[in-house]
């Protein structure tokens, strides 16, 4: 359990250093993806406000999908990932396939994020090569992920806060 900002030691000797506010802001910040800033403008200009309807439909779909997954985790708390459910109900081969395709998908998503960051930075610093920006950001993110969990959570908390403030500012100035 997470209690405020205190670290809790688990029965296996590990320590949970992320507080409830860290976990909540990591979840909120994770839902506000780069595509919202980079790709939404082009999509909205091409399709108009109907894209909001599509976002709502997809959001509703994923809401129910994650509710169902949450029910499965509640029913069987020994399973730690969706891959364990796939392995149990569809077999070892399907579970292995799902695990590897998920890993490859995350790898591609990370590379897309690095490309988006270099696009943003090159807007302000056009002379900087994209590969240098991407390697620098990758190194910074690696260092951030190698730090203590509490520092990682605090950094992610403030990055998510910046995203939320940026979205609210864009909506307010757009009105």
UniProtKB/Swiss-Prot annotation:
Is Transmembrane given among the entry's keywords?
yes
Chief place of localization:
membrane
Per the UniProt record, the source organism is Lactobacillus delbrueckii subsp. lactis
Provide the Gene Ontology terms for cellular component. Answer: plasma membrane
Q: What is this protein called?
A: Uncharacterized transporter in pepV 3'region
* Domain of life according to the entry: Bacteria
This protein's membrane topology, according to the annotation, is: Multi-pass membrane protein
Query: Which family is this protein grouped under?
Result: Belongs to the amino acid-polyamine-organocation (APC) superfamily.
Q: List the disulfide bonds.
A: none
The alphabetized UniProt keywords are: Amino-acid transport, Cell membrane, Membrane, Transmembrane, Transmembrane helix, Transport
Q: Which PANTHER family match?
A: D-SERINE_D-ALANINE_GLYCINE TRANSPORTER (PTHR43495:SF2), GABA PERMEASE (PTHR43495)
Q: Name one GO biological process term.
A: amino acid transport
Q: Which InterPro entries match?
A: AA-permease/SLC12A_dom, Amino_acid_permease_CS
Q: Where are the transmembrane segments?
A: 25-45, 46-66, 97-117, 124-144, 155-175
Q: Where in the cell is it found?
A: Cell membrane
